[in-house]
Amino acid sequence: MKRRRRWRGWLLFPALCFCLLCEAVETNATTVTSTTAAAATTNTTVATTGTTTTSPNVTSTTSNTVTTPTTVSSVSNLTSSTTSIPISTSTVSGTRNTGNNNTTTIGTNATSPSPSVSILTTVTPAATSTISVDGVVTASDYTPTFDDLENITTTRAPTRPPAQDLCSHNLSIILYEEESQSSVDIAVDEEEPELEDDDEYDELWFPLYFEAECNRNYTLHVNHSCDYSVRQSSVSFPPWRDIDSVTFVPRNLSNCSAHGLAVIVAGNQTWYVNPFSLAHLLDAIYNVLGIEDLSANFRRQLAPYRHTLIVPQT
């Protein structure tokens, strides 16, 4: 019995030690867990209460200048549509220059062949009339000038207008004497003095009538000639229409070729004149005026005159 009790005592003692050890381990585990949780809480607090530093604001000012190009285009009393001829142009707005070759460049300056330039095809100008009284032709208050077609904007167009032959019509060209040189907006070369002697003007006939009698077939690339004469009578022809304006492309007449045109506007009609017939027409005018140089600029040579009227027969 004593052995059993002693043996039981020895068995209970390790069991008691084992229980105490287990409690100690549980206590230690609890302690470790608490400590870890506290540490985590502390770390979170530190992160939350950290100091935040804000750098000062920087202000930057940028100044931008925007330049908007402005295009001003004005054509009074004109309603137009455009078509083209195959020449190259550069536009010069509001500038009148006279070069060494005595050519005037206003609005459009023809240079070399290739891209196209638009020209006026339909015009509705202000009213104008020509009246004959006792053989003297006078104009109304409004007289069309060479500047009627100056401010046409150059654009590209796909087609070329058909050329017509002036010699296929009976026509007259009427030159009016200029009353005031200041009213003619034509640039004259400063190196070439202007004619100021009225006696020289009196030697010319005013008005001058030219007639062309041509009944023939017309071929675009064949240079036909026509006979021009000066009419001695100054009686106007009421059924014939007055031309409002005449312009030339290119403007330097010395470059007349199959690609050049004269644009003649009468009311709401427009004629495109082939340069071959135009050359003969100008030759007749120059011969009567005593101008020998056919390559001289048409606008400059006609500076003493108010207007050129070409009257085709209807």
Swiss-Prot record:
Supply the alphabetized keyword list.
Glycoprotein, Host endoplasmic reticulum, Signal, Virion
Protein name as it appears in the record: Uncharacterized protein UL116
Q: Which organism is it from?
A: Human cytomegalovirus (strain AD169)
The record's subunit annotation is:
Interacts with gH. Interacts with UL148.
- Outline what the protein does: Chaperone protein that cooperates with UL148 to regulate the abundance of gH complexes in virion. First interactor of gH in the host endoplasmic reticulum, regulates the early folding steps of virion assembly. Then, UL148 is recruited and favors the binding of gL.
Sugar-bearing residue positions: N28, N43, N57, N77, N101, N102, N109, N151, N170, N217, N223, N252, N255, N268
UniProt key word Signal: yes
Q: What is its main location?
A: virion
